[in-house]
Amino acid sequence: MSETAPAPAAEAAPAAAPAPAKAAAKKPKKAAGGAKARKPAGPSVTELITKAVSASKERKGLSLAALKKALAAGGYDVEKNNSRIKLGLKSLVSKGTLVQTKGTGASGSFRLSKKPGEVKEKAPKKKASAAKPKKPAAKKPAAAAKKPKKAVAVKKSPKKAKKPAASATKKSAKSPKKVTKAVKPKKAVAAKSPAKAKAVKPKAAKPKAAKPKAAKAKKAAAKKK
């Protein structure tokens, strides 16, 4: 009988072991609940900065000191979160939501950009304008092709040089006419020769005078009969 009694005690020991495992499983849930409690309840630093800058009516932008005052008035702890404010300003400037009008880094004045959408649209236009200079490069070969035409125009210029030679020949051809005009007085000499012919005509009239002699001879022959 004494040998069989320890068996139930051995079975009770393993049954008590699963209880710590359940407690370990419950602990992660508590840790998750602690993580939820750490999340800040409210807007982020960047949202607070953008609201404060948009609320300001200054044309030159909101300074860092004025921004801290606006955040402190909204219940934000500026002294503890000073580094977060500076990082938030730098990130907003890099994204393009804010424009830094004065100063460098986190110090200076800031204002909202006019329209974030317009900034994105202007960037592609600049790329298109950068692509436009490639077109003039294509036009340059055409201009180079037009240059040989100018060389052809230079070849045509000798024709102009030939024209003066032709005009010189025409002038030389016209010059004999002037010589002929100088020879015209010879025609006047030829015109005098008809006058001599007129002087010869009276000689031809002498045979007419011979006719009366023939008539006298006929009369003499008639008398002899």
From Swiss-Prot:
Keywords: Acetylation, Chromosome, DNA-binding, Nucleus. Residues 123-138, 146-163, 171-189, 198-225 have a biased composition (Basic residues). Residues 1-46, 94-225 are annotated as: Disordered. It is found in: Nucleus; Chromosome. Its main location: nucleus. One of its GO terms (biological process) is chromosome condensation. GO terms for cellular component: nucleosome; nucleus. Residues 41-114 form the H15 domain. Gene3D superfamilies: Winged helix-like DNA-binding domain superfamily/Winged helix DNA-binding domain. This is Histone H1.11L.
